[in-house]
């Protein structure tokens, strides 16, 4: 059972020096550092420091690696306002008939009834219209061409006019981010942020892992902006989270069952893969195919149904991702590990280093039964 501090948001705060926020990825992808968490009964003095390339040695023949194959849309649009001046939209989610929820900047100067123009080199200007304010998100409902009804149909427009939306704590602007802020297996468009643990997996590392007899399965969770936003309520006992669109296909369920049958371990790459798998098992009837919005909360006290191990990055203070990782290894332990990582000069957040939580490092009470 979690103690009272586990249900207080302020218990998930920590201080990160600004120079620990990674501004650029390492090359090659698998050369990022890897902090290996010791087994649950061991001391944190046994933390190990490796490279992500070495992670293949931590995996066993028969294991199943589950990755998130979402693709980041070029969802950042620079616009010219009808009244003059420039602005910016971040396209978030469809609202039907070509209408999309967007975050607008400057929001006060994009009001219902305003016309916006998309402009790009070698492209005809394209008109958009602000239809309404969205009170829940503080965003705007914007009319796009009526055939832009989902991520797949919108992607062509975004490819012509948009940019990959890097998180605000990354201040650099480099054309290489269009490729580097995608995983190597990103095939299903719909995210506005990358599933960042997967950014470490190079083609060479994936091939080496496969050669060890480790299977690979793909889930889809379209990462929304809310994933990286701080939680805003101090009392976490009735926490609710934004929903994100998830698909766990029948072949993934079959792969998990086959992994269990052969004595393998189910390893998630990233918190989004965890959320997808656990949501697909949340109905009480075991792991089932799933397609649709998910708002599952994973925090200390949660008993995992599917996931046994996790490769993950270092996350923002007071975020839902920090709660999820705390559910695996405990809040006190996690914050001690983060402090050790800061002292050891690990790089944090989207382009930063990684942490490996093996099945034996997971709290006994959190492990799948």
From Swiss-Prot:
Pathway: tRNA modification; tRNA-queuosine biosynthesis. Its main location: cytoplasm. It is found in: Cytoplasm. GO terms for biological process: queuosine biosynthetic process; tRNA wobble guanine modification. It catalyses: 7-aminomethyl-7-carbaguanosine(34) in tRNA + S-adenosyl-L-methionine = epoxyqueuosine(34) in tRNA + adenine + L-methionine + 2 H(+). InterPro entries: QueA (IPR003699), QueA_dom1 (IPR042118), QueA_dom2 (IPR042119), QueA_sf (IPR036100). Its EC number is 2.4.99.17. GO terms for cellular component: cytoplasm. Pfam families: Queuosine_synth (PF02547). It is an enzyme of class 2 (transferase). Keywords: Cytoplasm, Queuosine biosynthesis, S-adenosyl-L-methionine, Transferase. GO terms for molecular function: S-adenosylmethionine:tRNA ribosyltransferase-isomerase activity. The keyword Signal does not apply. HAMAP family: QueA (MF_00113). Transfers and isomerizes the ribose moiety from AdoMet to the 7-aminomethyl group of 7-deazaguanine (preQ1-tRNA) to give epoxyqueuosine (oQ-tRNA). Belongs to the QueA family. Monomer. PANTHER family: S-ADENOSYLMETHIONINE:TRNA RIBOSYLTRANSFERASE-ISOMERASE. This is S-adenosylmethionine:tRNA ribosyltransferase-isomerase. It comes from Synechococcus sp. (strain CC9311).
């Amino acid at each position: 059972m979690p103690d009272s501090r586990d249900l207080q948001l302020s218990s998930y705060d920590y201080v990160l020096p600004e120079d620990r926020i990674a501004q650029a990825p390492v090359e090659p992808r698998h050369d990022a550092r890897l902090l290996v968490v010791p087994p649950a009964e061991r001391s944190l003095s046994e933390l190990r420091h490796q490279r992500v390339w070495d992670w293949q040695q931590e995996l066993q023949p028969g294991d199943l690696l589950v990755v998130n194959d979402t693709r980041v849309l070029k969802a950042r649009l620079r616009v010219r306002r009808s009244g003059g001046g420039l602005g910016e939209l971040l396209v978030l989610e469809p609202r039907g008939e070509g209408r999309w929820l967007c975050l607008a900047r400057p929001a006060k100067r994009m009001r219902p009834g305003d016309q916006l123009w998309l402009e790009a080199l070698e492209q005809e200007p394209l008109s958009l219209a602000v239809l309404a304010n969205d009170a829940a998100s503080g965003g705007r409902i914007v009319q796009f061409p009526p055939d832009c009804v989902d991520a797949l149909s919108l992607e062509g427009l975004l490819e012509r006019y948009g940019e990959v939306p890097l998180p605000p704590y990354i201040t650099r602007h480099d054309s290489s981010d269009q490729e580097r802020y995608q995983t190597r297996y990103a095939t299903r468009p719909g995210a506005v942020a990358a599933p960042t643990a997967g950014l470490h997996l190079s083609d060479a590392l994936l091939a080496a892992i496969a050669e060890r007899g480790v299977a690979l399965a793909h889930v889809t969770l379209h990462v929304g902006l809310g994933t990286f936003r701080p939680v805003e309520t101090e009392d976490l006992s009735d926490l609710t989270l934004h929903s994100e669109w998830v698909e766990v296909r029948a072949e993934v369920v079959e792969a998990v069952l086959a992994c269990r049958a052969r004595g393998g371990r189910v390893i998630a790459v990233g918190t989004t893969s965890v959320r997808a798998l656990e949501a697909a098992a949340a109905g009480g009837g075991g792991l089932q195919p799933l397609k649709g919005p998910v708002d599952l909360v994973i925090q200390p006290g949660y008993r995992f149904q599917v996931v046994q191990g996790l490769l993950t990055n270092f996350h923002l203070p007071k975020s839902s991702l920090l709660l999820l990782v705390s559910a695996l290894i405990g809040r006190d332990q996690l914050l001690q590990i983060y402090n050790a990582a800061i002292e050891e000069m690990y790089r944090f957040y989207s382009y930063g280093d990684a942490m490996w939580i093996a099945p034996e490092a997971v709290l006994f009470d959190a492990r799948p039964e």
